[in-house]
């Protein structure tokens, strides 16, 4: 283990100091933009609470979407270039394993740095707030479930997952209609198709448990209707295309028929979604376009199903004598013309779905840092109060030198590319302010000599070791699954 | 003349700028503008991440980029290079967040209608990403999916003013 002190000894170049909290796509794209665009020399430090970088790219993106993680290559090139002593203009440091607000206070960063950017993402779960949501075996939030199969050290060996009896999971309910809900559907319905998963960086521990589940039916349950589904066409198409494995998608005609949607009233993306669904719902040989006939279902037919289910409100999670989920009570919703939603709770509108596993995928919630109230930093419901990235105090004034980018700035919406654009825009404002502000001092430093942490070099070793382990297991990467393994991974396997 | 596909009514203005640029500067094919980067200390290989081959004499293909500030740049390139490779090799402001694997829309370009039909039709996966592109037009494509060929020698593409990926939910 290396304990490198990062006290920045001032050289001839007077660099302004910038600290970024969080090393996911928003934090790293902000750093990248600053280092690429700033006309004045900068000393940029990214702080990450885990010993390893990349946040949701590493622990959120589905294992079968490795191309989405390619942004990590840009971050790596950026880190290597500016960590190198030969680069005379800017300087970059990564500090992992340190939580801002714990080992080092946000106040300390604010006192020491010329600018601080909060890019720590959305770390909480939105809840259903219904009976049985907490404490029932087999009920997980999407954040927990995704972190678990992606090998996040907080969840990879969590007993709630490892002690759960996966061999009884045949029917699954997923509440929510975003891309995360589709990712989870894909993982669960194709859990036994090894060619999809075995070479990916999915946690082997999770995959082995998931494989035991004889999943037959996955219902994606939404409060609103087909028009309001939030997932994107790419992810939906991936689900339809699983039909070559005998996995069939369904939508009840009362929720979807092509004729319900007048193309002139909708945008291109939605009209393409309507065409996709109406074509895929037809029997294979009756489809009109060749792109919906890429690979036929197996001759044995379909034996697993996923279904888009609409206009329902979950009311109660029911459990068996052992505390495991066995069903979900719901009611129908009425969607009014003004777009308001009305749950219909009379006896004719209440139903029960038998489910063996329930994932709530209602979106990630932004959480304020513990020091916010003391420092009078504003927080609006699920994101930091800000004006174009400049953080506001609780009374609405600009908080000097403090910025926010990514999901914690705007809430948990959008793909990596939108986060990137947001990071660039906030980065431009930081540069704008830094160019005109006087430097705080020449010797801004935070002494890390007595605090255990990882550096970029340490991450390079962990990375190398994970790739090496992966090679032995015929996977792209085999992640270290606990904090202990990660810290030890700096040294060797 | 470019038709603008209006997505939720928010994108027309930005698309118009690029469309206007393509319309109003047809004779500027050979004009190149140089922009200077302010790098007082050292030049950085980090900014130069493309790996472009030099075309053999007589086999050069031309491409013109219309940049966000309205300036134009023309390059001579090899057959087979993608527009994303070319833009990155010349330090133009085009990201390829997914590394050119058609999994994001950060390399969205607006193709001159005169060249659009000469391109092979976009596949579903490209269209799925274009659905999310900001400032989408009827001649929008992803730079990573267009390879230079003799058929499109002289192609002109505009970089949209913004590359932010949006979906309907961003506006709700």
Swiss-Prot record, chain B:
Keyword Iron: yes
Coiled coil regions, renumbered to chain: none
Domain 2Fe-2S ferredoxin-type: 61-163
A GO-annotated cellular component: mitochondrion
Presequence extent in this chain: 1-16
Highest taxon listed in the record's lineage: Eukaryota
Major place of residence: mitochondrion
GO biological process: electron transport chain; heme A biosynthetic process; iron-sulfur cluster assembly; P450-containing electron transport chain; ubiquinone biosynthetic process
CDD domains: fer2
Location in or out of the cell: Mitochondrion matrix
SUPFAM superfamilies: 2Fe-2S ferredoxin-like
UniProt cofactor note: Binds 1 [2Fe-2S] cluster.
A Pfam short name: Fer2
Remaining remarks: Present with 14800 molecules/cell in log phase SD medium.
Function: Iron-sulfur protein that transfers electrons in a wide variety of metabolic reactions. Involved in heme A biosynthesis and in iron-sulfur cluster assembly. Transfers electrons from adrenodoxin reductase ARH1 to heme A synthase COX15, a heme protein that catalyzes the conversion of heme O to heme A. Required for the de novo synthesis of Fe-S clusters on iron sulfur cluster assembly protein ISU1. Interact in its reduced state with ISU1 to productively deliver electrons for Fe-S cluster synthesis. Essential for coenzyme Q biosynthesis.
Subunit and interaction comment: Interacts in its reduced state with the apo form of ISU1.
Family recorded in the similarity comment: Belongs to the adrenodoxin/putidaredoxin family.
Record protein name field: Adrenodoxin homolog, mitochondrial
Source organism: Saccharomyces cerevisiae (strain ATCC 204508 / S288c)
